[in-house]
Amino acid sequence: MNINQINTKLIKPITPTPQNLKNYHISFLDQHVVKKYIAVVLYYQSAPDNGRLEDSLAETLVHFYPLAGRYIKTDLTVDCSDQGAEFIEAEARGDVRVTDLIGKTDTIHLCPEQYFGLDEGVDDPLLSIQVTRFSCGGATIAVSVSHRVFDVSSLETFLSAWSSASKTGGGVAPVIPSFALASLLPNKDEKFGLDSNKCQGKEQKIAVKRLLFEKRALTRLTSERTSGVRAACAVIAKALIRLDRTTHGKSRDFVVFQPINMRGRTGVPSPKNACGNMSFGSFTRRVSAKEEVGIGELVGLIGDGVRRGIAEYTEILCPDRDGRDVIIHVRNKNIKEVFKSETFVVSFTDWSKFGFYEVDFGWGRPIWSGVGPQRPRGNQTIMMRSKEGDGIEAWVHLNEDDMDLFEQDVEIKLFLS
């Protein structure tokens, strides 16, 4: 697919950010996330160019002002001087239609250049958007945001606000985000910190495959008390464990890792529309290489791991506790357990509950939503809701050699799309 970027500009808030908001101090969680960008791609069958995208973005950035700023890593702050969000206009050459792209995982040409946070330079935009138009009248909108300041839930809040402003022309009350997490969990001297990047493996060439778990398959895999996401995760985890045994020539102990969105789950509730990072890593118990674990047991393990993670982090916003100490204690305990010997980590991220299919800029809802380019150091599977809403799409990221073997797994072949 030949994509030509025809224009790049910086979109600034329509009104200047007040002086008292110029320096946004990131939170303790923001401080210690993995350095990367989070990207989602939305596909629209019809997308007339009426100029509202840019205007509504400028209106929305008034409330989401850190996204128009620049990160100053030496100060752990965002300089909110309205430097602007990157806005790229592109066009697809030839007769490729948006509908031809549904189900395809190669999204890199539809997305802004990925900075991946390796340097986190003072000139790197925290928010980049690429609108790619097709001769059929359709378009894709790719939104890439720095994980240093936002998690996926925050990205959903931003997309809801921007699309609402575009669709209504500002005729309804805007979605107002809260940036109070930074004051509730302020950043802390680095000597007390946790470097999530040190927990990552080596960089590798990544291949991506999409698995589709349709409603009928999920019904077969689940019971009334089992979520479809966990059942799909269990199938993939079982295949990855078999793959790990093949590549290492032996069974290894393993754990399953999954971030938990703690909004609405803390003893003291987080602010409404809380933006920033509010996701915490949960781990299953360590499973011995000698244990034979089936799909049903894996479903239970994953559920237990999530419940344990929620219990461990529930008091992070309590006024009589220093939430940062809770985070340090839990994460250090988990890291010590996982890395005390050779352990295989199976990693999942659940995006299925986010409302990407509700993002209507005034042209109707997306006909599909996809995951932007990832650079995991190890395996990573992102779970997405299918367009119909009753199925699960799994975007599996593995190194290229492992992916060749993964695709040959008998169970996985049933779900390759």
Swiss-Prot record:
Name the InterPro entries on file.
CAT-like_dom_sf
What one GO molecular function would you report for this record? anthocyanin 5-O-glucoside-4'''-O-malonyltransferase activity
Please give the tissue specificity annotation from the record for this chain: Expressed at higher level in recently opened, fully pigmented flowers.
Q: What is this protein called?
A: Pelargonidin 3-O-(6-caffeoylglucoside) 5-O-(6-O-malonylglucoside) 4'''-malonyltransferase
Q: What is the lineage of its organism?
A: Eukaryota, Viridiplantae, Streptophyta, Embryophyta, Tracheophyta
Q: Which domain of life is it from?
A: Eukaryota
Activation/inhibition comment? Inhibited by the following metal ions: Cd(2+), Cu(2+), Fe(2+), Hg(2+) and Zn(2+). Activity is strongly inhibited by CoA-SH and partially inhibited by acetyl-CoA, caffeic acid and bisdemalonylsalvianin.
Q: Which UniProt keywords apply?
A: Acyltransferase, Transferase
How does this chain assemble? Monomer.
Which Gene3D superfamilies does this UniProt record tie to the protein?
Chloramphenicol acetyltransferase-like domain
Tell me one Pfam family matched here. Answer: Transferase
Supply the EC number(s): 2.3.1.214
Q: In which pathway does it act?
A: Pigment biosynthesis; anthocyanin biosynthesis
What is the role of this chain?
A: Catalyzes the transfer of the malonyl group from malonyl-CoA to the 4'''-hydroxyl group of the 5-glucosyl moiety of anthocyanins. Anthocyanins are ubiquitous colored pigments that are responsible for petal color.
**Which protein family is it in?**
Belongs to the plant acyltransferase family.
Enzymatic reactions: 4'''-demalonylsalvianin + malonyl-CoA = salvianin + CoA
Protein's GO biological process: anthocyanin-containing compound biosynthetic process; pigmentation
The residues responsible for catalysis, as annotated, are: 147 (proton acceptor), 360 (proton acceptor)
What sort of enzyme, by top EC class, is this?
A: transferase
